[in-house]
């Protein structure tokens, strides 16, 4: 049976939540992270205005100030973000009980069995997007696909406030031209190895010799080759969404990073 998997990503999550509480900062460059008064720590999230100046997640606060002198830093309030994350999960729960959080601001949803009552995946994604704006005041980017890997790629494809399909009859056209580093689980080290093999795009990876990939990357080579070709049967794992894990740097990391 063909599956319908969504991946929902809350856009600039921490900054978006903060702007709900600081409407006077809308349209101005804003970043959340570290200790703004001491200028210690790193950027956890920047809003899209700050990103246009070159501010990036993981950048030291002093570096962000250099590239964007008018930026406003706000200290992180994890309890607040967790509350919004749980409210997002409550919205998702209206469409499926098969939900797998990916960090605090992203989730996979298996809506295969929801079509009869809720409509197809694209319609469900539209409803979720609309409700997130209306009920929580934030936007999401949603990928709609037949597996988790391409659903995630779909949510990354266009931001903010977008819905992108990656169906079986279109993923080659949409995904294969993207940089291979856009594929989930291709980190910096793996990307460098693939680059040394002449693999630049997801399409290059899909058309590569699987045996050679295994020789260079071990078991992960075969896994990534399968992902690039649309072979991903991994299930959406049923997680306890009432106790979401915070997977970003700890408060201590934020205060000691330079």
Where does each model-flagged region fall?
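Short acidic, glycine/serine/threonine-rich loops at helix termini
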Residues: 17-19, 42-45, 150-158, 218, ...
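Catalytic palm subdomain of template-directed nucleic-acid polymerases
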Residues: 109-125
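DNA-contacting surface of Y-family translesion DNA polymerases
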Residues: 182, 190-248, 252
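Long, highly charged, low-complexity intrinsically disordered interaction regions
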Residues: 120-124, 128-177
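Residues that scaffold, gate, or flank divalent-cation-dependent active/transport sites
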Residues: 1-104, 108, 115, 228
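Short Gly/Ser/Thr- and Asp/Glu-enriched loop/turn motifs at secondary-structure junctions
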Residues: 102-106, 145-148, 241
């Amino acid at each position: 049976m063909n599956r319908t998997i969504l991946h929902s990503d809350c856009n600039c999550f921490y900054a978006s939540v903060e702007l709900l509480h600081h409407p006077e900062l809308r349209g101005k460059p804003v970043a959340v992270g570290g200790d703004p008064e001491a200028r210690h720590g790193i950027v956890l999230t920047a809003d899209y205005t700050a990103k246009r100046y070159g501010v990036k997640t993981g950048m030291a606060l002093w570096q962000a100030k250099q590239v964007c002198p008018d930026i406003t830093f706000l200290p992180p309030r994890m309890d607040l973000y967790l509350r919004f994350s749980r409210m997002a999960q409550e919205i998702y729960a209206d469409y499926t009980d098969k939900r797998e959080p990916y960090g605090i601001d992203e989730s996979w949803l298996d809506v295969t069995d929801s079509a009869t009552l809720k409509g197809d995946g694209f319609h469900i994604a539209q409803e979720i997007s609309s409700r997130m704006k209306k009920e929580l005041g934030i936007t999401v980017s949603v990928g709609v696909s037949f597996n988790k890997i391409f659903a995630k790629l779909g949510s990354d494809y266009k931001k903010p406030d977008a819905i992108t399909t990656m169906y079986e009859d279109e993923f080659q056209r949409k995904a294969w031209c993207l940089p291979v580093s856009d594929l989930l689980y291709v980190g910096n080290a793996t990307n460098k190895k693939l680059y040394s093999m002449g693999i630049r795009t997801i399409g290059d990876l899909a058309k590569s010799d699987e045996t050679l990939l295994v020789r260079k990357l071990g078991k992960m080579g075969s896994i990534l080759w399968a992902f690039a070709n649309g072979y991903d049967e991994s299930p959406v794992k049923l997680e306890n969404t009432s106790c979401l894990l915070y997977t970003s740097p700890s408060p201590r990391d934020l205060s000691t990073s330079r």
